[in-house]
Protein backbone atom coordinates (compact mmCIF):
# COMPACT_ATOMS: atom_id res chain seq x y z
CA UNK A 1 0.00 0.00 0.00
CA UNK A 2 1.06 3.60 -0.45
CA UNK A 3 0.90 6.63 -2.71
CA UNK A 4 4.32 6.38 -4.32
CA UNK A 5 6.46 9.45 -3.58
CA UNK A 6 4.16 12.06 -2.01
CA UNK A 7 6.79 14.72 -2.59
CA UNK A 8 6.54 14.20 -6.36
CA UNK A 9 3.81 15.20 -8.85
CA UNK A 10 3.11 11.53 -9.56
CA UNK A 11 2.55 10.75 -5.88
CA UNK A 12 0.25 13.76 -5.47
CA UNK A 13 -1.76 12.60 -8.48
CA UNK A 14 -2.24 9.18 -6.85
CA UNK A 15 -3.39 10.91 -3.65
CA UNK A 16 -5.83 13.08 -5.63
CA UNK A 17 -7.36 10.05 -7.36
CA UNK A 18 -7.57 8.18 -4.05
CA UNK A 19 -9.53 11.07 -2.47
CA UNK A 20 -11.90 11.52 -5.42
CA UNK A 21 -14.65 9.63 -3.57
CA UNK A 22 -13.39 9.99 -0.01
CA UNK A 23 -13.39 12.74 2.60
CA UNK A 24 -10.58 11.19 4.64
CA UNK A 25 -7.72 8.70 4.24
CA UNK A 26 -9.60 6.22 6.47
CA UNK A 27 -13.20 6.22 7.72
CA UNK A 28 -15.60 9.15 8.01
CA UNK A 29 -13.76 11.44 10.44
CA UNK A 30 -10.27 12.97 10.52
CA UNK A 31 -7.77 10.62 12.18
CA UNK A 32 -4.07 9.89 12.63
CA UNK A 33 -4.15 8.34 9.14
CA UNK A 34 -4.80 11.83 7.74
CA UNK A 35 -2.06 13.28 9.95
CA UNK A 36 0.48 10.71 8.69
CA UNK A 37 -0.18 11.53 5.03
CA UNK A 38 -0.50 15.29 5.66
CA UNK A 39 2.88 15.39 7.43
CA UNK A 40 4.53 13.59 4.50
CA UNK A 41 3.58 16.35 2.03
CA UNK A 42 5.97 19.19 1.23
CA UNK A 43 3.08 21.64 1.03
CA UNK A 44 -0.35 22.20 -0.47
CA UNK A 45 -1.13 20.22 -3.66
CA UNK A 46 -1.56 22.30 -6.85
CA UNK A 47 -4.99 23.72 -7.64
CA UNK A 48 -5.65 21.27 -10.48
CA UNK A 49 -5.54 18.39 -7.98
CA UNK A 50 -8.68 19.71 -6.31
CA UNK A 51 -9.59 16.54 -4.36
CA UNK A 52 -6.16 16.47 -2.71
CA UNK A 53 -6.21 20.25 -2.15
CA UNK A 54 -9.68 20.10 -0.56
CA UNK A 55 -8.52 17.36 1.80
CA UNK A 56 -5.24 19.19 2.56
CA UNK A 57 -6.99 22.44 3.53
CA UNK A 58 -9.51 20.56 5.69
CA UNK A 59 -6.83 18.61 7.61
CA UNK A 60 -4.75 21.78 7.93
CA UNK A 61 -7.62 23.30 9.95
CA UNK A 62 -6.87 20.65 12.62
CA UNK A 63 -3.23 21.80 12.98
CA UNK A 64 -3.56 22.57 16.70
CA UNK A 65 -5.54 19.38 17.40
CA UNK A 66 -3.58 16.82 15.38
CA UNK A 67 -2.26 14.96 18.41
CA UNK A 68 -5.80 14.48 19.76
CA UNK A 69 -7.29 13.00 16.57
CA UNK A 70 -8.35 9.34 16.93
CA UNK A 71 -6.35 6.32 15.81
CA UNK A 72 -2.66 5.41 15.75
CA UNK A 73 -0.24 7.09 13.37
CA UNK A 74 1.37 4.36 11.24
CA UNK A 75 4.03 4.28 8.49
CA UNK A 76 2.81 5.60 5.13
CA UNK A 77 2.91 2.08 3.66
CA UNK A 78 -0.23 1.30 5.68
CA UNK A 79 -2.37 3.78 3.74
CA UNK A 80 -3.48 4.34 0.16
CA UNK A 81 -4.14 2.08 -2.85
CA UNK A 82 -3.15 -1.56 -2.31
CA UNK A 83 -1.37 -1.83 -5.66
CA UNK A 84 1.04 1.07 -5.09
CA UNK A 85 4.13 1.05 -2.86
CA UNK A 86 5.17 3.94 -0.64
CA UNK A 87 8.47 5.48 -1.76
CA UNK A 88 8.27 8.79 0.08
CA UNK A 89 11.17 7.68 2.29
CA UNK A 90 9.82 8.98 5.57
CA UNK A 91 8.28 6.84 8.31
CA UNK A 92 5.34 8.29 10.19
CA UNK A 93 5.81 8.49 13.93
CA UNK A 94 3.22 7.18 16.35
CA UNK A 95 2.17 10.57 17.71
CA UNK A 96 2.72 14.29 17.33
CA UNK A 97 4.30 14.28 20.76
CA UNK A 98 7.00 11.89 19.53
CA UNK A 99 7.57 14.16 16.53
CA UNK A 100 8.16 17.09 18.86
CA UNK A 101 10.35 15.15 21.25
CA UNK A 102 12.48 13.65 18.48
CA UNK A 103 13.33 17.13 17.25
CA UNK A 104 15.28 17.69 20.46
CA UNK A 105 18.37 15.71 21.41
CA UNK A 106 18.31 16.07 25.18
CA UNK A 107 21.79 14.84 25.90
CA UNK A 108 23.82 15.26 22.72
CA UNK A 109 26.05 12.53 21.27
CA UNK A 110 27.78 10.04 23.56
CA UNK A 111 31.26 11.16 22.61
CA UNK A 112 30.61 14.88 23.12
CA UNK A 113 33.20 16.31 25.42
CA UNK A 114 31.72 17.46 28.72
CA UNK A 115 32.66 21.12 28.84
CA UNK A 116 30.99 24.45 29.44
CA UNK A 117 29.74 24.73 25.87
CA UNK A 118 28.15 21.28 25.88
CA UNK A 119 26.50 22.01 29.23
CA UNK A 120 25.04 25.22 27.84
CA UNK A 121 23.71 23.44 24.74
CA UNK A 122 22.18 20.67 26.83
CA UNK A 123 20.46 23.19 29.11
CA UNK A 124 19.06 25.03 26.10
CA UNK A 125 17.68 21.77 24.70
CA UNK A 126 16.10 20.89 28.01
CA UNK A 127 14.50 24.33 28.12
CA UNK A 128 13.14 23.88 24.57
CA UNK A 129 11.79 20.46 25.47
CA UNK A 130 9.97 21.78 28.55
CA UNK A 131 8.58 24.72 26.57
CA UNK A 132 7.15 22.42 23.90
CA UNK A 133 5.65 20.08 26.48
CA UNK A 134 3.93 23.01 28.22
CA UNK A 135 2.38 24.23 24.96
CA UNK A 136 0.66 20.95 24.06
CA UNK A 137 -3.09 21.59 23.69
CA UNK A 138 -5.57 20.20 26.18
CA UNK A 139 -7.59 17.21 24.96
CA UNK A 140 -10.89 18.36 23.46
CA UNK A 141 -13.83 15.98 23.84
CA UNK A 142 -15.41 15.28 20.45
CA UNK A 143 -18.12 13.06 19.02
CA UNK A 144 -18.81 11.62 15.57
CA UNK A 145 -22.50 11.83 14.69
CA UNK A 146 -24.41 10.30 11.77
CA UNK A 147 -27.65 12.17 11.05
CA UNK A 148 -30.73 11.09 9.10
CA UNK A 149 -32.49 14.12 7.59
CA UNK A 150 -35.90 13.30 6.10
CA UNK A 151 -37.73 15.38 3.46
CA UNK A 152 -41.47 15.92 3.17
CA UNK A 153 -41.95 13.88 -0.01
CA UNK A 154 -40.35 12.59 -3.20
CA UNK A 155 -40.60 16.03 -4.82
CA UNK A 156 -38.28 17.69 -2.30
CA UNK A 157 -35.08 19.00 -3.91
CA UNK A 158 -32.51 16.88 -2.02
CA UNK A 159 -29.55 18.82 -3.41
CA UNK A 160 -31.04 22.01 -2.00
CA UNK A 161 -31.82 20.23 1.27
CA UNK A 162 -28.18 19.16 1.66
CA UNK A 163 -27.03 22.66 0.74
CA UNK A 164 -29.20 24.04 3.55
CA UNK A 165 -27.81 21.55 6.06
CA UNK A 166 -24.20 22.27 5.13
CA UNK A 167 -24.86 26.02 5.34
CA UNK A 168 -25.12 25.58 9.11
CA UNK A 169 -21.75 26.74 10.38
CA UNK A 170 -20.72 27.12 14.01
CA UNK A 171 -17.62 26.78 16.13
CA UNK A 172 -16.94 23.14 16.96
CA UNK A 173 -18.89 21.69 13.99
CA UNK A 174 -17.31 20.03 10.93
CA UNK A 175 -19.45 18.40 8.22
CA UNK A 176 -18.24 15.18 6.62
CA UNK A 177 -19.38 12.73 3.96
CA UNK A 178 -23.02 12.31 2.96
CA UNK A 179 -25.26 10.14 0.80
CA UNK A 180 -28.90 9.72 -0.16
CA UNK A 181 -30.62 6.59 1.19
CA UNK A 182 -33.96 5.28 -0.20
CA UNK A 183 -36.73 4.99 2.41
CA UNK A 184 -39.62 3.93 0.16
CA UNK A 185 -42.24 5.33 -2.23
CA UNK A 186 -39.53 7.13 -4.19
CA UNK A 187 -38.48 9.14 -1.14
CA UNK A 188 -34.83 9.40 -0.14
CA UNK A 189 -33.36 10.70 3.10
CA UNK A 190 -30.06 12.54 3.50
CA UNK A 191 -27.55 10.68 5.67
CA UNK A 192 -24.71 13.01 6.66
CA UNK A 193 -21.70 12.68 8.97
CA UNK A 194 -20.39 15.41 11.25
CA UNK A 195 -17.85 15.82 14.04
CA UNK A 196 -18.68 18.10 16.97
CA UNK A 197 -16.89 19.41 20.02
CA UNK A 198 -19.07 18.17 22.87
CA UNK A 199 -18.96 21.36 24.95
CA UNK A 200 -19.93 23.57 21.98
CA UNK A 201 -22.42 21.64 19.84
CA UNK A 202 -25.16 19.26 20.95
CA UNK A 203 -27.67 17.17 19.00
CA UNK A 204 -30.48 19.45 20.17
CA UNK A 205 -28.72 22.44 18.60
CA UNK A 206 -28.23 20.52 15.36
CA UNK A 207 -31.87 19.46 15.26
CA UNK A 208 -33.09 23.00 15.95
CA UNK A 209 -30.98 24.46 13.14
CA UNK A 210 -31.70 21.71 10.59
CA UNK A 211 -35.48 21.55 11.13
CA UNK A 212 -35.59 25.34 10.78
CA UNK A 213 -35.43 24.70 7.02
CA UNK A 214 -39.06 23.62 7.22
CA UNK A 215 -39.70 23.96 3.48
CA UNK A 216 -37.36 21.02 2.88
CA UNK A 217 -36.95 19.13 6.18
CA UNK A 218 -39.67 17.07 7.82
CA UNK A 219 -37.53 15.67 10.65
CA UNK A 220 -34.02 14.79 11.80
CA UNK A 221 -32.84 11.71 13.71
CA UNK A 222 -29.49 10.65 15.15
CA UNK A 223 -28.57 7.38 13.38
CA UNK A 224 -25.23 6.86 15.17
CA UNK A 225 -23.31 8.64 17.91
CA UNK A 226 -19.74 7.78 18.90
CA UNK A 227 -17.28 9.46 21.21
CA UNK A 228 -13.90 10.14 19.63
UniProtKB/Swiss-Prot annotation:
Protein name from the UniProt record: Elongation factor 1-beta
Instruction: List cellular component terms (GO).
Output: eukaryotic translation elongation factor 1 complex
Question: Matching Pfam families, A to Z?
Answer: EF-1_beta_acid, EF1_GNE
Q: Which gene encodes it?
A: eef1b
Entry keywords, A to Z? Elongation factor, Phosphoprotein, Protein biosynthesis
The UniProt entry, under PROSITE patterns, shows: EF1BD_1 (PS00824), EF1BD_2 (PS00825)
Q: Which organism is it from?
A: Xenopus tropicalis (Western clawed frog)
Q: Which protein family is named in the record?
A: Belongs to the EF-1-beta/EF-1-delta family.
Q: Name one GO molecular function term.
A: translation elongation factor activity
This protein's assembly is summarised as: EF-1 is composed of 4 subunits: alpha, beta (alpha subunit of the eEF1B subcomplex), delta (beta subunit of the eEF1B subcomplex), and gamma (gamma subunit of the eEF1B subcomplex). Interacts with elongation factor EEF1A1.
Q: Which Gene3D superfamilies match?
A: 1.20.1050.130, 3.30.70.60
> Does the record carry Translocase as a key word?
no
Q: What function does this protein fulfil?
A: Catalytic subunit of the guanine nucleotide exchange factor (GEF) (eEF1B subcomplex) of the eukaryotic elongation factor 1 complex (eEF1). Stimulates the exchange of GDP for GTP on elongation factor 1A (eEF1A), probably by displacing GDP from the nucleotide binding pocket in eEF1A.
Post-translational modification, briefly? Phosphorylation affects the GDP/GTP exchange rate.
| Composition-biased stretches (Acidic residues) | 97-116
Residues bearing Phosphoserine are 109
Could you tell me which CDD domains the record lists for this protein? EF1B, GST_C_eEF1b_like
Amino acid sequence: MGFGDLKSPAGLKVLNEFLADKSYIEGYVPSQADVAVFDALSGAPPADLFHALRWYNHIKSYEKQKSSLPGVKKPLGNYGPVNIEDTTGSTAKDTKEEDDDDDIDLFGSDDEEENEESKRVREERLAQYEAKKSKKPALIAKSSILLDVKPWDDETDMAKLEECVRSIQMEGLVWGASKLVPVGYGIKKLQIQCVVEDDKVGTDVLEENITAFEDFVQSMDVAAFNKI
